[in-house]
C-alpha cells in the first residue's frame, strides 16, 4: 500500500496495490501490521457500512472523549467526496479540511484520526461506504459540525436543491459557535503511550 500525506498532519490517503487480470482484480484492503508500520498504531474494533443515494450528505461527525474514534473509510460502490475537518483547539490547522474522492474505481482509503470531524457527500447514483472505527459507537458522545458551514470552504459538489441531510445533521452548529472537546496539546491515543 502507498501512503499519501495530505496538507494536514495525520490525515492520509491510502492507495492499495491492485492486481488486475482477465478475471478481475484483487487487493489487500487492510493489514494491521502494514498500517501500523506506515501510518500509526491503532486497534480497529467496529466495521460499519452505509448505502446512500445521490445528494446524501452525512456529517460532519465525531465522538467526544473518552469515546473518540479514528476512522479508516472507503467507498466500495459508486463515488463520494470524503472530508475531514481539524477540530483540535490550538492546532495550526484548526478549522481546515482535506477533501478526497473515494470510489469503487480508485480503491482509495482515507484515514481520519481522532480530533477530526468527518463527513461525505454521495456523487454517484448510489454509493456503498465502509469504515473501520477504533472505538465503539457511543450515542451519548455523538457530536457534529454543520456540513453547511460556509466558513469551512468545502465544495461538496452537490447543488443545494439536491442535498439530502438527516434532521440530526441539519441541527449541528457552525464551527464559530462550537466549543471543541479536543485539544491539540493532549495525546488522543493514550493507550499507546
Which positions does each model-derived feature cover?
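Non-catalytic, conserved peripheral segments adjacent to functional cores
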Residues: 1-105, 124-126, 133-142, 146-193
Amino acid at each position: 500500500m502507498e501512503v499519501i500525506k495530505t496538507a494536514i498532519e495525520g490525515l492520509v490517503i491510502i492507495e492499495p496495490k491492485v492486481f488486475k487480470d482477465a478475471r478481475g482484480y484483487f487487493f489487500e484492503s487492510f493489514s494491521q501490521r502494514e498500517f501500523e508500520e506506515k501510518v500509526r498504531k491503532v486497534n480497529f474494533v467496529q466495521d460499519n457500512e452505509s448505502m446512500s443515494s445521490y445528494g446524501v450528505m452525512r456529517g460532519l461527525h465525531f465522538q467526544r472523549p473518552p469515546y473518540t474514534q479514528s476512522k479508516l473509510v472507503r467507498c466500495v460502490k459508486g463515488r463520494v467526496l470524503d472530508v475531514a475537518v481539524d477540530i483540535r483547539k490550538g492546532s495550526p490547522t484548526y478549522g481546515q479540511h482535506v477533501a478526497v474522492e473515494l470510489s469503487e474505481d480508485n480503491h482509495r482509503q482515507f484515514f481520519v484520526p481522532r480530533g477530526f470531524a468527518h463527513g461525505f457527500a454521495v456523487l454517484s447514483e448510489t454509493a456503498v461506504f465502509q469504515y473501520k472505527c477504533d472505538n465503539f459507537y457511543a450515542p451519548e458522545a455523538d457530536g457534529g459540525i454543520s456540513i453547511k458551514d460556509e466558513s469551512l470552504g468545502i465544495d461538496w459538489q452537490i447543488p443545494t436543491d439536491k442535498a439530502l441531510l438527516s434532521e440530526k445533521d441539519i441541527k449541528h452548529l457552525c464551527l464559530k459557535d462550537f466549543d471543541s472537546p479536543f485539544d491539540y496539546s493532549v495525546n488522543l491515543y493514550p493507550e499507546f503511550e
